[in-house]
């Protein structure tokens, strides 16, 4: 088992939830956390603990974004008009690697980050290899022609269990996607409940 898979399993067990909706998640078999003390009964969690847990879950879902980068998303979310929690989700879903994942070009958020890093994606006809690049509504994302027959792409295109959300239009024949709008929390197909307002509260302490 790779270190990346081990890290995913550990986070799933710590949260007690199948964060990415994976069939092989350990929480599908048991409902306690990792380690020798994982089976102990847990008491009521403090407000701080609840907020921290919400932050760890949301940050981990997007490929474990660094704390420094996640704080920048928080700062931008509270600067923008409107609900800060909704703004945070919008910023995360505008990440290029998130759009690549949502478009079913690859199977996981982790694979999407690597796919972008390796230069397989164009935005509006220009190669972009920065996973955190902020996609705007109307932008066209394209898998480079030379990359379309890679096994990682072919396998992902056959995943019937994951639908493309309504805010992205995908042409799987041309391997292109267009973001039609920035989504709100209820539009994003998370396998588990995300609580961005608790994340905002965590950083606002």
Swiss-Prot record:
One of its GO terms (cellular component) is small ribosomal subunit. Keywords: Ribonucleoprotein, Ribosomal protein, RNA-binding, rRNA-binding. Gene3D superfamilies: Ribosomal Protein S4 Delta 41, Chain A, domain 1, RNA-binding S4 domain. Residues 94-155 form the S4 RNA-binding domain. Residues 1-12 have a biased composition (Basic residues). GO terms for molecular function: rRNA binding; structural constituent of ribosome. GO terms for biological process: ribosomal small subunit biogenesis; translation. One of the primary rRNA binding proteins, it binds directly to 16S rRNA where it nucleates assembly of the body of the 30S subunit. With S5 and S12 plays an important role in translational accuracy. Part of the 30S ribosomal subunit. Contacts protein S5. The interaction surface between S4 and S5 is involved in control of translational fidelity. This is Small ribosomal subunit protein uS4.
